[in-house]
Structure formats: C-alpha cells, structure tokens
Amino acid sequence: FAEFNRYTNSPVANYHGQIYNLPFNMNTFNKMWGVVTPAEAKAKIEEQKAAAGITDPQNLEEQAISLVGTDIYEKLIKGYTGKQWGRPCTELPAFIIKRLPVRFTYDNNYFNALYQGIPDGGYTAMVEKMLEGIEVRLNVDYLADRENLNALADKVVYTGPVDAYFGYRLGALQYRSVRFETEVLDTDNYQGNAVVNYTDAETPYTRIIEHKHFAFGTQPKTVISREYSTEWKPGDEPYYPVNDEKNGALYAKYKALADAETKVIFGGRLGEYKYYDMDKVIEAALDVAGKELA
C-alpha cells in the first residue's frame, strides 16, 4: 500500500530556550550536567535519587526522579507532563513514565525498532489505497443506528469510547483531548526538527510540529501545528485515556460488559481504554484479525 521514507523520530525539548535531546540519553545528560561518560551520568542520577530518598516510587514524580534525577524531572518532565495530563505529576500513577526510554548512549533515536519511517505521500494516501473496493460511510453515528449497522455483518469492530458504547451506564471514563493550531509561515525552516516539546509549565502548548521535516520537504514555506492538551468534555474528540487508578477500576467493569458482547470486537485507545503507540495498536489489530480469520 505504500513505500516508506527513512524518517526517524528524534524529538528535542525546549526549556526556556535551552535545547535538550530526547529521549533522555548521554547528549541530554551532557547538556544538563556536563558529564561525558555513562558512569558519570549514572552517578549523578544516583546522587539525586539518594538525595530525594526515593526507594519505592508511588507516583509519576517519584518514578521520574528515580529514573533520571531531579534536574531532568524539573526541567524536562514536570511541566510537560502536567500540561499533557492536566494534573500534577504527584497525582499521576508511576507507570505512565515507563513509556519514556532512557539510554546511556549518544543515540537520539526515540524508538528501538529496526524499521522506522513514514509512508511516502502521507498516511492519507496509504489509507485510501487500503480502502479501495471497500464501502465507506462517513458522518455516520454508529451508536445511533447500531441495530441496522450490526445487521450488515457477523462481527463488528468498535474503536469508539467503550463507555459510550454502553451508554455510560456505569459512569463516564475520563479522556484527554488535543487542540491543534496550524499556521503557514513564510520561511523555509521554522525550528529545524519535526517535533519540539515545550517542557516548561508556562508555555500553553505541549509541542510544535513542523510537518515538512517528516518528509524532508524543501518547500519555500512551512506549516507548523501547535499542540494543546485539553480536558475532554462531551462533544470533543477523545485522544487518549486517563489511566489512573479510579479510571482503571471503572474500565475493568466496562471490560466485563465488553467481553460479554460476543459479536463485537473492542479495539484501540478508546475501545480498550489504553494508551497505545501506533505500532502496538496495529500489531494488536493484526493479532485479532489473525485469530478471527483462523
């Protein structure tokens, strides 16, 4: 369906005008502390971890400090994560931060995957080819007409909010939404990187995306999108779940209801109320398809 380019995700963080490499690696540690070797970086982290007295992290703040020390937490995690989730790091579970890779090498590649890239021509072109010969109905509210739509198939794949499927009968799960502010700029290169995270608490947006760098564009102008993380409310598009203890307990009840729906497959971030990266959700979809078609 598509050829892929060689794009490798290597975001950077901007903290009050200071640029740090992501994921946290030796380039980050060198900029932060002036350390040169992995042993020096590990010693600095252990020193800060010991000073904080953390042995059993109970929340995201403690988990982050135990992974990368106080300085990196304060400058590169605290403000950004607070904006992303809309609540202080002390109120978020420790496991969220485990998604952030930490490396003691001078490697700015965010992912460890052997193959990386973005479809030439973009994802829209790829999906259009995938949908050739398939009937697509747009602007259809499945939940408002599920009886008629269910009659069209033996199995239904539902990727909407799991609580909405059951009419919020057990209460509403919490989600985060995202608002994008896109602008065309009369310059050929605005920030020099596809993704720049703004990790201070004062900057209202979480990051700026400069789209041309995903495809190594050479256009005379550039398009940027500022990304704002917002609290979800009915009518907004939910982007990702709030995986804290309260919502996890409520989702477990909805999952029991979902498991009883033998004709419906619940999938994706919203259907499974799970923070999925793209590669993992595609892998999960292929696994389910393989089992269903076996």
Where does each model-flagged region fall?
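A short alpha-helix-loop-beta-strand transition element characteristic
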Residues: 1-16, 72-75
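Mid-domain catalytic core of redox enzymes
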Residues: 140-257
